Amino acid sequence: MKNLQESYTESELKDLAGKGIFGSKGSDGYLLIKTNFGEGEKVIAYADLNNDKYTDIITYKQEKNSIYFYSYTYDHNQYIFNKSEVLFILNSTLDNPIVKNVIVNSFIKTSISPDFLISISNDDKNKYETHLFYKNKNKDEYLYKNLNINSNIVVADINGDRNMEIIFFKDNMRQIFYFGDEYSKDGTIKSFDEILSSKDKEGASNYKFLNKKFSDKYGNAFVDLNGDCLPDLILTSEEDQILYLEIYYHTEEKYNLDSYSFKIGEYGAFLIGDFDRNSQLDILFPHLNEPKVTIFYNQFQSNHNWDENYCEIIKNNNDVKEKKYKKVFNEFFLNDSKTYKTIDLIKNNSQNYTFYGKETLIRAGDFGSTGIPGLLAIFKTNETNNKNKIIKLFEFEKDKITEVDLKLDTYLEKMDIQYATFFDFAEDGRLDLIIQGKDKIISIWNNNSPDKFFIKNKIVLKKGKFSTLEFGTSFRYVVTDNEGLRSDNVVAQMPQTSGMIIPLPFAYQGIGRSNNYIEHLYAISTSFDKVSNDIISVNKDSFTPIIPNTQLIITKGYEKEKVKWEIELVVTPTENLLILLIVIIIILFIILFIIIFLHSKERNEDKEQDSDNFRAWFA
């Protein structure tokens, strides 16, 4: 088998994507694998449509306005994605429609499979349509509903009641659309300010947030930022060349507002991750005009006593100290190296590189399993010998950042790269790459650092015969590394909320080269209390110890409104498992031989002793 480090002819390179698998397990590095994505298709979402616990890939072909899905199967060491027939056709009244956002989750209670919420805009992004596709028990085909939402959207389970809410902008105000427990054909709409506390409703009005469009260019999210185990809502908005970062902290009853503002021309869409490995989520912004990123470090006090009740400890500490929820990031531009750090990604000739596009073209993922998310970025280059877009990987480890050479530049230069994202093709806990060209998709298998360990988790909500990813959940682990240092790490499970982000459909945490047991793994989610009707309760479970290279799948169901967790552990063996088993068997045989030898020797000595005693008796 060839890989891209070896030579290919021009015709072979041209036809490389689309069939079978390339690369051998004996090769280290990043290898191109052939996949059967159709020409002109684009990856738009991940989902488990057939409820087999594997992740399927959703694609869209604009030429035919068709949505397809590729179901994952494993057959004789081959990882195959079987293409479906057309799931449904998109019909839009817009000129030159562009699919902006695809969210596969549960919106209608009577659906018998995951629903598709699709946001479409035109080239100028001044017109939007929002389409919902769903199945009910009467028909096995997708039904269509136009939600009459003509703005960009953000989706989250804001109330924690297992019903997805859609935040949108209409009539110069922010509104929330949802279907609720009792399915209404037209849904229900309420004002965005209803989720805010009285004080913060006033604060949001003063900032004019409530009548300001939120942006899909700079990112939105639904994650726990302040460590109290309740997911917080992050929105971005822009006005007069100022970018506003709005953070709505989730208390047990309402949301409290915190906001920051800075010049809009400096940054692109933000990323979230634990970039300093202190069990708190930080925010990273790429610079638009230079190959740099700035990480704003979470300023909440980390809890390093590894107590099972750390959520309550953090919440109580902040309540006692300030009688309110402390600001996470203090001020964005304090002259304090502990608050933020700007990192040069490209050291040499950096003036020739800029990030490609403002939106979603940089990704975070721990592809090196170091315990800190790395970066996948697309750059435009002004070098005379290469004016195309190029892809680079950057790995964080402790206090340094390293560029990882894909060794695929010769091939990738021939593509008109549109975007790139992470995926786990082989379900083996390695973050592979999907690279979207203008007319085709290529896939790159990560066979780097096989001696590093990971844990891969997800919480899904059981809805009848299918399940969907839960919003606002997080995972936290505690581990001791090979140097004897104890550390903790947090990662958020972030299903798609807005924009063409295509986030990972699971929470992935690298462990590095520590092959010790994971001492504690905490899985955290929230539930709606039907009795009080508006109180969020925290569901938290601790697993100890956990073997590295494990996938934890938690299926969260409800019986009589009580939460029921079903746990599945899938252990991914290391590449050297066979050798390890052979060595163990050989050692066991050696031990068995020694035991038999010693036992035989002892029996012979006993016989000789008995013979001597017998002769002595008669003598």
What label would you give each PLM region?
Residues 1-30, 65-88, 127-143, 173-199, ...:
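Beta-propeller blade repeat segments, especially FG-GAP/WD-type strand-to-loop junctions
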Residues 2, 11-14, 19, 255, ...:
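Gly/Ser/Thr/Pro-enriched helix-cap/hinge segments flanking short amphipathic alpha-helices
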Residues 45-51, 102-111, 154-160, 221-227, ...:
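Structural signature of eukaryotic scaffold interfaces centered on beta-propeller domains
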Residues 51-61, 109-119, 160-169, 227-236, ...:
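Acidic/hydrophobic-patterned starts of short beta strands in beta-sheet-rich repeat architectures
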Residues 61, 72, 119-121, 135, ...:
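Short, structured coil/turn linkers that connect adjacent secondary-structure elements
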Residues 68, 78-157, 162-167:
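A generic tandem-repeat structural signature
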Residues 212-252, 262-397, 414, 418:
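Beta-propeller domains
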